[in-house]
């Protein structure tokens, strides 16, 4: 075990070493002797046990330190969110996690996974021959704990009351009636001097006797237009070849659409 990790251990620590791969018995025994000189209690667990969260023993939640990557280093590609979360559940509040990986490991990705799993203060201890890192568990951490959100205690009614009182006292509210003048309150007049139609009374504007606004000319044009016969087939102006048998314009030359045509009196007389 590296000296940088041994210096972080205390005599009252309960350490769990999570090993993986094939390890010779003498190597495991040597690691046990080396770590036992620094700590109070030591136990060994295989990494495969923590892959499934249902297989994690509740009695393992007594460790203050977890060493993962000894005696064989472990790849950061294996330390995913699920595995790191299962290892976190075995640590006491304020516990520490130490890992060792090959130098080719991606520290940025591992640091992100540690943070998302619930660890704090991820730190890189060494990267000479191996990537050795550490992370901690919050001292006030308890599994399944909950905290009230800070805005849940706010008094909404009191806040609105303060807003209303402060606005009236400082005079920040503008009275919209003071922005209107007397002329704005009068009923609008039509061009010819009579009251215009409102929403409640639908009056049609008529031209005055001495109209100068042009409304009289518009009404006269509408009356002239109403006197023009309306064609039922739309082909009266084309000529007799396109007119129906009862067309009053039969016998008259073609004319422009909309042109006023005077029908002679003898045309309307019967031939008999």
From Swiss-Prot:
Function: Component of the cytosolic iron-sulfur (Fe-S) protein assembly (CIA) machinery. Required for the maturation of extramitochondrial Fe-S proteins. Part of an electron transfer chain functioning in an early step of cytosolic Fe-S biogenesis, facilitating the de novo assembly of a [4Fe-4S] cluster on the cytosolic Fe-S scaffold complex. Electrons are transferred from NADPH via a FAD- and FMN-containing diflavin oxidoreductase.
Subunit description: Monomer.
Cofactor(s) listed: [2Fe-2S] cluster; [4Fe-4S] cluster
One of the GO BP terms on file: iron-sulfur cluster assembly
Binding site for [4Fe-4S] cluster: 233, 236, 244, 247
Name this polypeptide is given: Anamorsin homolog
Binding site for [2Fe-2S] cluster: 192, 208, 211, 213
Keywords (A to Z) from UniProt: 2Fe-2S, 4Fe-4S, Cytoplasm, Iron, Iron-sulfur, Metal-binding, Mitochondrion
Pfam families in alphabetical order: CIAPIN1
Positions of region (Fe-S binding site B): 233-247
Keyword ATP-binding: no
Annotated family: Belongs to the anamorsin family.
Region (Fe-S binding site A) location: 192-213
Species name: Schistosoma mansoni
Motif Cx2C motif 2 per record, residues: 244-247
Short motif Cx2C motif 1, span: 233-236
Cellular localization per UniProt: Cytoplasm; Mitochondrion intermembrane space
UniProt-annotated stretches for the region Linker: 151-185
Disulfide cysteine pairs (residue numbers): none
């Amino acid at each position: 075990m590296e000296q940088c990790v041994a210096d972080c251990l205390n005599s009252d620590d309960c350490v769990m070493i999570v090993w993986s791969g094939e390890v010779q018995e003498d190597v495991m025994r040597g690691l046990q002797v080396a770590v036992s000189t620094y700590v109070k209690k030591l136990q060994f667990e295989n990494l495969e046990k923590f892959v499934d969260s249902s297989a994690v023993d509740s009695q393992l939640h007594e460790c203050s330190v977890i060493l993962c990557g000894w005696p064989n280093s472990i790849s950061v590609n294996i330390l995913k969110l699920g595995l790191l979360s299962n290892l976190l559940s075995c640590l006491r509040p304020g516990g520490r996690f130490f890992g060792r990986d090959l130098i080719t490991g991606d520290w940025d990705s591992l640091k992100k996974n540690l943070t998302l799993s619930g660890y704090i203060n991820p730190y890189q201890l060494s990267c000479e021959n191996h990537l050795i890192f550490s992370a901690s568990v919050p001292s006030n951490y308890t599994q399944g704990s909950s905290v009230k959100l800070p805005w849940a205690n706010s008094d909404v009614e009191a806040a609105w009351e303060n807003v209303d009182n402060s606005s009236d006292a400082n005079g920040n509210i503008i009275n919209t009636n003071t922005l209107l003048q007397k002329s704005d309150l009068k009923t609008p007049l039509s061009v010819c001097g009579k009251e215009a139609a409102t929403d409640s009374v639908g009056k049609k504007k008529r031209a005055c006797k001495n109209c100068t606004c042009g409304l009289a000319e518009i009404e006269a044009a509408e009356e002239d237009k109403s006197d023009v016969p309306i064609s039922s087939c739309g082909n009266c102006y084309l000529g007799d070849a396109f007119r129906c048998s009862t067309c009053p314009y039969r016998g008259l030359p073609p004319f422009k659409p909309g042109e006023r045509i005077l029908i002679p009196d003898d045309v309307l007389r019967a031939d008999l």
